[in-house]
Every structure is written in structure tokens, then in C-alpha cells.
Amino acid sequence: MRSSAIACTAGIALCIAAPASAEVVHSCAGDLAVETVATGLTNPWALAFLPDGRLLVTERPGRMRIVGSSAKVLDGKLSPALAGVPKVFASGQGGLHDVVLDRRYGENHTIYFCYAEPVDGGARTALARARLVDEPTPRLDDVKVIFRQDGPLSSGNHFGCRIAQTGDDNLFLTTGDHFSGRDQAQNLANHLGKLIRIRPDGSVPPDNPFVGRSGAKPEIWSYGHRNPQGLALNPATGKLWEHEHGPRGGDEINIIEKGKNYGWPVIGFGIDYNGARIHESTHKDGMEQPIWYWVPSIAPSGMAFAPESMIPAWRGNLFVGALAGQALVRLELDGEKVVKEERLLPQLRARIRDVRQGPDGALWFATDSPNGRILRVAPAK
């Protein structure tokens, strides 16, 4: 279904009752306090909450930091860059990207992170695991690359690089088509434009759909993707939701199913940047339809469900960051259908790169700029 955003009266004002660093904006659910938590980050890309409430944040040039002193994340203090992060390809759209905590982080202190790995001739998407050591100086130990994208190398674009872990401990990773290799998204002999599923040690689960198929990469779970930069498990159903960038128009949200073909570049709803036609059509037998798409593009990045939102009207909603759209997009759901869209925070004029629901029930997001910020959205008091 095509996007049809609703508009609520939008404004901005100072709120004496809110924290001093907060602004108040209006939304369909009432007034919101938008608080700046941290500043001075260079193109922050991903957020992950540590058990004590502090934040682990990645910066695209290749740094990982912890935000917050002790359990007081709101103080905005940035740690020094963590030692142990591998060298990244920090050019074009490449760099250090997503980070998530292992489901058993409290026991093993394991994290997973995705980055553009430099190699002769370009770069490729890589997924690594490491142990986060917090004291006395935060660092990464036992770093091990558990997946490397195979296929034509990228000159700097479309790395994908979002991670999700399911209840069976398996890891999902998005990979992009490297922009110039869009036809490769339909080729099962490489990892371009795919959703990858592996075990935490990098081995392949035996029930992956293309295990044993001649010429197919066994790590592939689904294919026909362009540049997926949103990945989240729907807590109501356990299903994996993904979003990806279209070209000029045609950004998509998909519900991912085992072995399915999501169509890029054969079908879609966009056109090339020069106005040329890309797709055969918008539909084709054997290829999946998105549950939602945007024309014109919003350039989606980051995605989070909000089952425990501080705002009752938002519980169960899906939130998507918008880079070109410069907004936080709220999608109201009825089962697996999007029934309403609201564009939040356009007043900030910020490229929103990642969004997460915090343990406090507030929404937290990162803005993508050379002086990037981490912000928190909660009801205004």
C-alpha cells in the first residue's frame, strides 16, 4: 500500500515543565518533549541500550562509544572511542554501521556489529562479534569476523548492514546491492541485495532455504533487496520486518519470509535518478509485494516497534527514521497492515538515522550529521 501521511498541527515551543534542553512539539497524540541527550557525534549510525541504561553508539567514520556515566545516560557524557574496532571503509556510504547486543549479553558481554570492510578494489559488508569490556577503559576484545559478503565489491554505496537476532539465537543481516550491481540482487550465487541468516559463530543453520542448492549461497534467507537499512522483529507476531531504500521513489517495508524474492530490480515503484525506467512492472508472479511504500522517497533508516511506549496511543506502532524525509515516521498498524502514517518532528530538519525504544518506554533516535545528536522523545509534562 502506498504511503498516505496524515498531518497534525505542527509547532514548536519552549516548555518550562520539561527539562531545560527539551523542546515541545505537537503530534496527533499530544505534546511531545524532545530532549537532546548527547551531541558531538560524527554521523552516528546505530544505538544499542546496555543493561544499565547507558547507550552504545556507532559513528560512521569507525568509532564506537558509550554514552552516559555509570547508569546516568542522560548526562550525555561520551566515552573515548573503544579500542578494538577493526579498520573500516569510511568513504561514500561506508563505515561502521549497526550494533546489537547478544540476547545473553548479561552472561557473555557479546555484541555484534556490521561495517564496510576495506579490501583491494573496494569494500564489502562484514559482520563481526566481540566481547565488550567496560572497565577500566571500555574496549572490544576477542573480535572475530563471522560473515563477509561475497560478490562484486562496492565503490562506496549500498552496504545494507542492519542486524537482528531471533529467539533461537540466529542472526539476520541485511546486505545491499552495491548500487552498480543491482541485477545481482536476483543472483543466488552471491550475497548482494540479500537477507543473510547465520548462527552466532558464523556457521549456516541447516534449515536455511538454499542449503544444498547448487550454485546458491547457503547463508541467504531472502533476496531481491536493494539497500535495506531497517530490520526489526515484530513483538506481537515474532515476524521479521524490513525496510529498504528505493531509487527515486519506491522505498519499501516488507515482512520477510523464508526463501522469498522481494523483486528488486525486476519490480518496484520507483524510477532511476535520471528519470529512466528500471522495473518491468510493479507486480510479477513469484515476487513479493511490500506492505507499504513511499513515493516520493523518504530514505528510510532504522526501525523500531514500540510495544511499551510511554504514549498509550503509540503502543504497538512502528517507527522509521527518514533521512531525506527529515522526520520520524509513525506507522499505526492493524495486524500486518499499515492503516495510518504520521510524520513527526519535521521542525528539527534532521536526517534521522536510527530509532530505538528505550527501556524507559521513550523513543530515542540519532541524527546523521557531522555534529550528530542523540535525542529522546517522551510526553511533555
Regions found by a protein language model. Give the residues of each.
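N-terminal signal peptide c-region/cleavage motif recognized by signal peptidases
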Residues: 17-19
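Conserved blade-ending motifs and adjacent loop-strand segments that build the rim/top face
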Residues: 225, 338-359
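Acidic, Gly/Ser/Thr-rich repeat motifs that build Ca2+-stabilized beta-propeller blades
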Residues: 22-182, 230-233, 238-246, 296-334, ...
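Surface-exposed loop and turn segments in beta-propeller and other repeat-based domains
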Residues: 77-94, 142-159, 200-221, 265-295, ...
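Bacterial N-terminal signal peptides that target proteins for export
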Residues: 1-9
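Beta-propeller blade signature
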Residues: 126-135, 188-201, 256-257
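Loop-centered beta-sheet repeat module
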Residues: 189-198, 207-236
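Short, conserved, GDST-rich strand-edge loop motifs in beta-rich repeat architectures
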Residues: 173-192, 250-252, 256
